[in-house]
Amino acid sequence: MEKLRLNVALLRKRVPNLTTAAKSVGLRPATVSNLSTGKIPVGRAEVRTIVALAELAGCTLDELILRGESVEMIETGIKILDLFAPIAKGGTVGLVARPGMGQLVVLAEMLHRLKMEGYKTILLNPKDNHPEMNDILDDVDFVANSIEETFNMMISAGVDKKFVLTADRAYVLSGEMYTLQEMLDDKDITEVTTFLLDLKGEAVDDDLPYGPLDTLWQFDADLAARHKYPAVNPIYSTSSILEGSYLDPVHHGVQQKAQKLLRRYRELRSIVTVHGVGRLPESELQVYKQGEKLEAYLTQPFYVAEPYTGKKGVTVGLKETLSDVKKILESSPSEFNAEDLQFIGKIES
């Protein structure tokens, strides 16, 4: 089957305020978001949806739909992200969270890890005063105060470099991120992976808070409240890389089974919270216990948090993550203990 995906970069460039534009032609912003991230494969989209998007972008269908192009994944060594919502190299990642869910810790960890991989890291300072951003400065190479300054820093560093750019949602809403994208396109600077965050916590109420994204990290209040970090929701977080035709079959199979288990586990957990575990039949109890183990395994110590947690940061390769998750999915009730799986790296044989 031919690989098809939306030209997300073109949509971002041509339709700055996609939420409003989509609604104006009768499209649900959530549908557009799911098509952009690959949660809904392009091949399964309604024809009228694709045509409407092409009309909004003022482009042909051939320009809107990319055929046969590969999407390269940046492996982070963070289990929950690499498994459920991997980063597309040169793509845009949107973080959706309310304050206190740990998005800045995840962002700081990403900057730390990518800097170690040779990326030049740039922070575009927020328009408003946000002293909490000081926490990520240790792993930022350059701090810019405007789009022009950001662009000039990239030019000075060299167009052949790999960049990571962090920016607040305000720059998306003002249209300045699209201006920067045009400037980068003019100079053929393509190795820019962007992290967008919403420091005001308003993005959670918007179906399409940043416009089209390659990767969405939806943070979870329940996980944060129970100190299951990183508190990234494995059900609602997604990536264009997860579109079946792009993904390694083993990764795709494990990801689908793990997500199915966690979805059911969350349903059962709501019952257990109210009525206790004794209310579950034996078959469901096994599912619940497996979900508990998997949720625990997906927690992970971060390098940037070492001074606060006293735990050494760990990196787990994707191959090891897939192998470990497969073991948990196939485990018997007596195998593994959820407490022993919490905040570890890989499962030691």
Language-model features, listed with the residues they occupy:
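A short, Lys/Arg-rich alpha-helix, primarily the initiator
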Residues: 1-18
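P-loop NTPase nucleotide-binding/switch module
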Residues: 2-3, 48-51, 55, 59-91, ...
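Short alpha-helical DNA-recognition segment
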Residues: 15-35
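Residues at alpha-helix caps and immediate loop-helix transition turns in enzyme cores, especially N-
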Residues: 17, 46-49, 175-177
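Short coil turns linking two alpha-helices in DNA-binding domains
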Residues: 28-31, 46, 60
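Short, solvent-exposed alpha-helical "recognition" segments
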Residues: 37-47
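Short, charged early-sequence alpha-helical segments and their helix-coil boundaries
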Residues: 44-45, 51-54, 305-308
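P-loop NTPase catalytic core
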Residues: 82-347
